[in-house]
């Protein structure tokens, strides 16, 4: 699995979202690298890990990342948040958890109302096999929908998407399955590490209310909503997100 290591200081592992790669965090890298050693992961089937055949399953991927990185705060955006949360719940080397536009459960349920309908991910999976590039384009548009900086964020995501080659279709299907089926809520009350939950006020994929609900289930948690932010608030609101991350990491024992 490809992992870029940039900067010096306390270690921070960054995990990207569906269909993208570690390069998507460029605005955060610019602001955080002077202060931290950043470990930017390309998940299997994505970016420079496109040919990595490791199944996109939480235990396998987390174990491989943990073996290649030092004790660190783990940050997960969107799909990457599931891997980061699983790591925080199972590995002592995870010092803290930062979730950006990610919750333990991405789909709506009778006891989890602030999420999207399951059919959204099922539909993307069906369309992916028929129209690969068109489906990716529609997902990127959903990532930025509602954001105060939607146009510039969409342009950035489009440029990033194929900068390291196209993601593997099999990995994309596995990722959609994770988003559709994973429910890690039971792990939250037992989280021994501090956590930070950063939501976008206008996020159409992961409503801010869902992130605040997840934080409320977690001990040692704090939640922050980025005004005007969409599903990728670290793009259009990089200063605010990076400042929140620096305050959080500084508070982690």
Swiss-Prot record:
Q: Fetch the Gene3D superfamilies from UniProt.
A: alpha/beta hydrolase
> In which broad location class does this protein mainly occur, judging by the first location in its UniProt entry?
cytoplasm
**Any idea which UniProt keywords this protein has?**
Biotin biosynthesis, Cytoplasm, Hydrolase, Serine esterase
Q: Which reaction does it catalyse?
A: 6-carboxyhexanoyl-[ACP] methyl ester + H2O = 6-carboxyhexanoyl-[ACP] + methanol + H(+)
Localization of this protein: Cytoplasm
Keyword Transferase on entry: no
Q: Name one GO biological process term.
A: biotin biosynthetic process
Family matches, as InterPro entries = AB_hydrolase_1, AB_hydrolase_fold, AB_hydrolase_sf, BioH
GO terms assigned for molecular function: pimelyl-[acyl-carrier protein] methyl ester esterase activity
- Top EC category: hydrolase
Q: Which Pfam families match?
A: Abhydrolase_1 (PF00561)
EC no. given is: 3.1.1.85
Signal peptide annotation: none
Where along this sequence does the record place binding of substrate? 18, 78-79, 139-143, 231
> What does UniProt give as GO cellular component?
cytoplasm; membrane
Quick one: which pathway? Cofactor biosynthesis; biotin biosynthesis
Q: Assembly and partners?
A: Monomer.
Record function comment: The physiological role of BioH is to remove the methyl group introduced by BioC when the pimeloyl moiety is complete. It allows to synthesize pimeloyl-ACP via the fatty acid synthetic pathway through the hydrolysis of the ester bonds of pimeloyl-ACP esters.
Name listed for the protein in its UniProt record? Pimeloyl-[acyl-carrier protein] methyl ester esterase
Gene that produces this protein: bioH
């Amino acid at each position: 699995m490809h992992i870029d290591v940039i900067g010096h200081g306390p270690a921070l592992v960054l995990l990207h979202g569906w269909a993208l790669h570690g390069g998507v965090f460029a605005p955060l890298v610019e602001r955080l690298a002077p202060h931290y050693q950043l470990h930017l992961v390309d998940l299997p089937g994505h970016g420079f890990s496109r040919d990595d055949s490791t199944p996109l399953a939480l235990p396998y991927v987390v174990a491989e990342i943990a073996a290649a990185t030092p004790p660190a705060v783990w940050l997960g955006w969107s799909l990457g948040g599931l891997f980061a949360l699983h790591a925080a719940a199972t590995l002592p080397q995870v010092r803290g958890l930062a979730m950006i536009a990610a919750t333990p459960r991405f789909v709506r349920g009778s006891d989890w109302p602030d999420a999207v309908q399951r059919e959204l991910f099922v539909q993307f999976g069906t369309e992916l096999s028929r129209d690969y590039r068109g489906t990716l384009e529609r997902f990127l548009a959903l990532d930025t929908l509602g954001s105060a900086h939607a146009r510039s964020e969409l342009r950035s995501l489009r440029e990033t998407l194929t900068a390291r080659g196209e993601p593997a279709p099999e990995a994309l299907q596995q990722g959609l399955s994770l988003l559709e089926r994973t429910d890690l809520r039971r792990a939250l009350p037992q989280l021994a590490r501090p956590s930070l939950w950063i939501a976008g006020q206008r996020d159409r994929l992961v409503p801010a209310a869902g992130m605040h609900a997840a934080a409320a289930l977690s001990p040692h948690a704090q939640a922050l909503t980025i005004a005007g932010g969409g599903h990728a608030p670290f793009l259009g609101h990089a200063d605010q997100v990076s400042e929140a991350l620096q305050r959080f990491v500084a508070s982690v024992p």
